[in-house]
Design a protein with these regions (language model features):
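Short glycine/proline- and aromatic-enriched beta-strand/turn motifs that initiate or cap beta-hairpins
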Residues: 20-83, 239, 243-246
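Transmembrane beta-strands of outer-membrane beta-barrel proteins
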Residues: 25-29, 79-81, 134-140, 183-185, ...
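Residues on the lipid-exposed face of transmembrane beta-strands in outer-membrane beta-barrel proteins
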Residues: 26, 64-68, 119-123, 137-139, ...
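Extracellular/periplasm-exposed beta-strand and loop segments of Gram-negative cell-envelope proteins
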Residues: 34-59, 82-114, 142-161, 169, ...
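Repeated loop/turn-to-beta-strand initiation elements of outer-membrane beta-barrel proteins
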Residues: 73-76, 129-131, 176-180, 208-211
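Solvent-exposed loop/turn segments connecting transmembrane beta-strands
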Residues: 129, 160-162, 185-196
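Transmembrane beta-strand segments that form the barrel wall of outer-membrane beta-barrel proteins
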Residues: 177-192, 217-218
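Predominantly the C-terminal beta-signal and adjacent terminal strand-loop region
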Residues: 193-245
């Protein structure tokens, strides 16, 4: 019995690398804020907008993903997705933010940072010539910070936390090379919500390389005594995927 178990482990050790397909994915482009409303603390601070009350600049972004496909249906990936957007301007009223009161009509510089680290498992339930569909789970770590600065004043609110979300992927094949992709992570709860969704056209260059172009939506926020923040970002996205064992 022990010999059989040992042989099974050895067999899996040899077979799994043969069935596995490691990959890397790079995504880049530009991101702009649609809205970004902030009140810190959530029950006592001044509510203001980093997009309507201040002017938010578009910025360059990138994302890096390492993937590992086992067999035909099991997918594991790790994602690093940094985001930093700056805003500036003047407000005609005092702003209470993170325990600091910023005087009215002073020059304000704000930085909104929302970096995320995600580990995803997805199972592809449907694998057909014209359609692919999978569902899974993403463990997301957010590393967020909002800072506000004016001459002689500075305050920052940081937040690191765990967010479980549902992962999904739908791919429609138009022909052997062209397809339309809908994928993302999303979940809503009483404490808040989070959506990160990509819609893109995908083109197969060869058996190892794939490129895509599309639109990404990042939206979500939380409302509690500590933080009130809801934001939405539009991404113009270009991506490239390379599979090593294919």
């Amino acid at each position: 019995m022990k010999l059989r178990a040992l042989l099974a482990i050895v067999f899996l050790g040899f077979v799994t690398p043969l069935l596995a397909q490691p990959s890397i994915d790079i995504e880049t482009g530009f991101v702009s804020a649609v809205y970004n409303d902030v009140r810190i603390p959530g029950d006592q601070g001044t509510l203001f907008s980093l997009t309507d009350d201040l002017m938010a600049a578009s910025s360059f972004f990138y994302r890096l993903r390492a993937g590992y496909k086992i067999g035909e249906r099991h997918n594991i990936s790790a994602l690093y997705a940094p985001l930093s957007v700056k805003s500036d301007g003047y407000l005609p009223y005092d702003v209470s933010f993170a325990g600091v009161v910023f005087p009215a009509d002073s020059a304000l510089d704000a930085v909104y940072k929302f970096n995320s680290y995600r580990l995803t498992y997805r199972y592809d339930f449907v694998l057909r010539p014209k359609i692919e569909f999978g569902l899974g789970f993403t463990a997301k770590i957010r590393d967020a910070a909002i800072s506000l600065k004016s001459p002689g004043y500075y305050a920052e609110k940081t937040n690191v936390g765990f967010v479980p979300v549902i992962n999904f992927r739908l791919l429609l094949h138009m022909n052997d090379r062209l397809g339309f992709l809908l994928e993302g992570d999303a979940l809503a709860a009483p404490q808040g919500r989070a959506e990160d969704i990509l819609i893109a056209a995908q083109y197969k260059i060869n058996d190892k390389a794939m490129m895509r172009a599309g639109y990404r939506l990042l939206e979500g926020g939380a409302d509690n005594d500590e933080v009130y923040n809801f934001s939405m970002f539009n991404y113009g996205s270009l991506g490239f995927t390379y599979t090593f064992n294919n």
